[in-house]
Amino acid sequence: MNIHAATPEHSPLGKTVSYQDQYDPSLLFPIARQTKRDEIGVDEAALPFAGVDIWTGFELSWLNARGKPQIGIATFRIPAGSPRLIESKSFKLYLNSYNQTRMDGIDALAAQLARDLSAAAGAEVAVSIALPQAFAAERIAELAGECIDELDIAVDNYAPCPEILSADSTAIVSETLCSNLLKSNCLVTGQPDWGSVSIRYTGPKIDREALLRYLIGFRRHNEFHEQCVERIFVDVLRACAPTKLTVYARYTRRGGLDINPWRSNCDAAPTDNVRTARQ
């Protein structure tokens, strides 16, 4: 593991790799957040948001002390204030390295995951693991908010364009808007990433048609999930001047992992972590 954060092009993305089934934390590939934050004028020493990247690992498996396979669903919470994010394919390869690794128990596994991921991210990563007897409690729900996807608009731009965002300064509101039409593409491979996004704010009333066009504008944009959400947050904050703003996206899984970035200037943490139907 190179914690000096190499560039995405050096990651396992788009490359043929061998799958290791014995524990190997060196598979993790951290990437500095600041490089992409520079593009949107954000300094990690003075972030305009708090936040967390919630990852769900649906394909976690290991061996118990007697060699019997075990499974679980893991939730990882990586602080947005960490200097590094973790590239998703390397994350998958790292989790796969537990497949033939014996662990003394669920607590030991969670502690080891947290230790390795915290070292990679440069900040404390919280880990929880749901065992099969808890799977029945898993539920599905859509993101909160009024969906704007049925607005009858014409669209001819498929790149982020914050200039089209606008808000009515004579109408101050508190509302939550959401869309299931968020699509971006992997920064390295160009593979499509599908998501839903919720925007909760207090401030001048945002033009909904303009917001929907703006979100659709990510359709040909190549960036990691976390970077897209931070770009949305910063663009809406600057163009529409809300006093309170929370942006929360939930992306469909790839390689057994989904990524759900959450950014806010008014809340300490997301109130829920419920997967959507597409997840």
From Swiss-Prot:
GO terms for cellular component: cytoplasm. The keyword Signal does not apply. The gene is queF. Belongs to the GTP cyclohydrolase I family. QueF type 2 subfamily. This is NADPH-dependent 7-cyano-7-deazaguanine reductase. The active site is at C186 (thioimide intermediate), D193 (proton donor). Substrate binds at I86, E87, S88, H225, E226. GO terms for biological process: queuosine biosynthetic process; tRNA modification. HAMAP family: QueF_type2 (MF_00817). Catalyzes the NADPH-dependent reduction of 7-cyano-7-deazaguanine (preQ0) to 7-aminomethyl-7-deazaguanine (preQ1). Its EC number is 1.7.1.13. Pfam families: QueF (PF14489), QueF_N (PF14819). Gene3D superfamilies: 3.30.1130.10. It catalyses: 7-aminomethyl-7-carbaguanine + 2 NADP(+) = 7-cyano-7-deazaguanine + 2 NADPH + 3 H(+). NADPH binds at S88, K89, R254, G255. Pathway: tRNA modification; tRNA-queuosine biosynthesis.
